[in-house]
Amino acid sequence: VGSKVVFLQKISGLNIPQIGLLGGLVFSLLAFQLEPPEGLSGDGWLVLVIALWMAIWWMTEAVPIAVTALVPLVLFPILNLGTITSVGSSYAGKAVFLTLGGFIIGLAIQRWNLHSRIAMETVKRVGIEPKGVIGGFMLASAFLSMWITNTATTVMMLPIALSVALLLQSEGEGDAVSKAAFGTSLMLGLSYSASIGGMMTLIGTSTNVMFKGYFEQNYGLEIDFLDWMMVGVPIGITLLVIVWWMLTFVLFPCEMIGHKGIGKIIDKKLDDLGEMSNAEIRTLLVFVLTASLWIGKGLIEPFLGGLVLNDASIAIFGA
């Protein structure tokens, strides 16, 4: 977002952050004086105005994004929309700590290139046939997106997928239509599978955790890590198979012969990674332990003498 704001400033000559800063303040001050629309309470109108004010500041980056997020913590108590305790609890609830812990673990996986090794080992084992290569990239992308952000997964996998696509474009055996179909299927499959993987675990994407918090707060029913996976994983696997089949057999059928150069690209990436470092091994062990606690806490708790595990505590422990 920041780069887009800078780009708009350069082409327009306007100071976008200053305009957003003043625009958000002026808009909110004027809107506060208006009567709420029919069917909306006064408090509801105030919350809506504050939300729009924050949206203006976020889009223009009038102040740092994190600072804008703290606006309700200041204004809600002043406008009697909630106490500092009730508002502040939303900034430090279980959902927030689960997101934080999962994010830190994901950063560690990226920091030591564990995600690259997992992806390359997965793709290497599917062979060199085009349809299998697409499936391998989709499987690796979906698995990684279960634990790190969809964007990080796609950014990491994209250059490798492009290398494979360009290799088959230039040296693969097949007509131009099949070569184009392979590249299209590979790129779309990579993107779709990252989104699908993100829905398979609670920490796959932040919206999952936000839904968990909202559901528990409003309906009093707790969703733990295993509960989510019992629904998300079967749906995710089904969607992966459907998307792979639609891309490779229906929308962009690819009639090509595999190219041994694909294996060489993957081997080169693995060679670049070298042997697993101590830090990478430790990260893998922490990841496996944390995921095991999330999934198997129901089996472990009876042996803990009354101690209770929760997903947020496990996430912080792993972090």
Where in this protein do the model-derived segments appear?
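Hydrophobic transmembrane alpha-helices of multi-pass small-molecule transporters
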Residues: 1-98, 217-219, 227-319
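Membrane-embedded alpha-helical segments and adjacent helix-loop junctions characteristic
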Residues: 8-9, 36, 53, 66-177
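Membrane-interface segments at loop-to-transmembrane junctions
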Residues: 10, 123-128, 179, 189, ...
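Alpha-helical membrane-protein architecture signal
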Residues: 49, 132, 136, 140, ...
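Transmembrane alpha-helix interface/packing and boundary motifs in multi-pass membrane proteins
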Residues: 55-63, 140-150, 191-203
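Re-entrant/interfacial helical elements at transmembrane boundaries that shape
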Residues: 69-73, 151-166, 187, 200-217, ...
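Membrane-core helix-loop-helix motifs of multi-pass transport proteins
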Residues: 171-253, 257
